[in-house]
Amino acid sequence: MSSNTQLTNCADLDVSNILFSKPETKSIPNTPISYNRINISYQNSDGSIGDLIVPTENLFSFGVQENTDMASSKVTGYSIPLVLWNRNGASNGEEQFINTIESIVNTCQDHLLTDSTKDALEKYDLDISDLKKFNPIYRKRDKGKIVEGKSPCLYPKLIVSKKDGNMNINTFFVDSSSGEDISPTSLLNKRMNCTCSLKIESIFVGRTISLQVKVYECVVDLLETGMKRLLSVQKPSIQIEHVETDDGEEEGEEEGEDDGENDGSIKDEDEQEEVEPEPEVEPEPEKPKKKGGRRKKN
């Protein structure tokens, strides 16, 4: 079989075609810490095998976010928060996308709980209670119960490569109007609507067990949220100084001429039209925080 990565539509995905590698043991350089990774692939309808990549609906996002190390504040990667419902709730397509991700989650959990996988991981007592946070879809909860009417969110990471201390973002970003590539870092904290192709990459097994979901490609429609000017301002008239040449002809020199003027092709931030974000969403939910603190002394 040849390696052939294809986009698998949610309606066409068959979880029985999801393939898992044997656990690979890896270690973090210069530390005694090791972990296991189970790579995920997919058998396409033509029999070829490639990465498992599914498309999202057109979703609202708060833009590219930096992931930082809590101790050093160093940037360790990037992610995109995706709001999975529109302002009116969930459309049929959005519900189907959520159901597709959760069917993949369930298939991965079933694989982890097989005797052969537990033996390979040397986690013989692993059970479903150890996988409570395995689902990457975040839902706001109050006293342990899901808050009704709040959109679930997904926080997929960008695909990056690290070499010699440098980090490069490999995820593709494309402008929906022009079709031109966009620099990912120009989208930091920029509100936008976007359609992504998500790579269901692997299962990470370390201190925690999590499903690794990455953004393979992202088509972006930026939302203009700046203020617009309401008062008209008359431009100053251009004064022309008449200079007599040796031939008796007159030349005009425009004062204040700026060769670098863009003729309004690029708007200043103050001149941007105010556009209501579409869809309107609740403020970005906080990511689940780890409980901590000092223990009470007896």
What are these regions (language model features)?
Residues E276-K291, N298:
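Acidic, serine/threonine-rich low-complexity intrinsically disordered regions
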Residues I240-V281:
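Acidic, Ser/Thr-interspersed intrinsically disordered low-complexity regions
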Residues S2-D164:
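OB-fold ssDNA-binding interfaces and closely related basic DNA-contact patches used
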Residues G206-G256:
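Long, highly charged low-complexity segments enriched in Glu/Asp and Lys/Arg with interspersed Ser/Thr
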Residues T5-L7, Y35-I40, N99, L126, ...:
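Hydrophobic transmembrane signal anchors and adjacent membrane-proximal interface regions, especially
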Residues S232-K235, E249, E261, K290-N298:
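Extended acidic low-complexity intrinsically disordered regions
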Residues I49-L52, Q65, S79, I146, ...:
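Compositionally biased, intrinsically disordered low-complexity regions
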Residues R139-L223:
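Extended serine/threonine-enriched, polar tracts that run as long, contiguous segments within proteins
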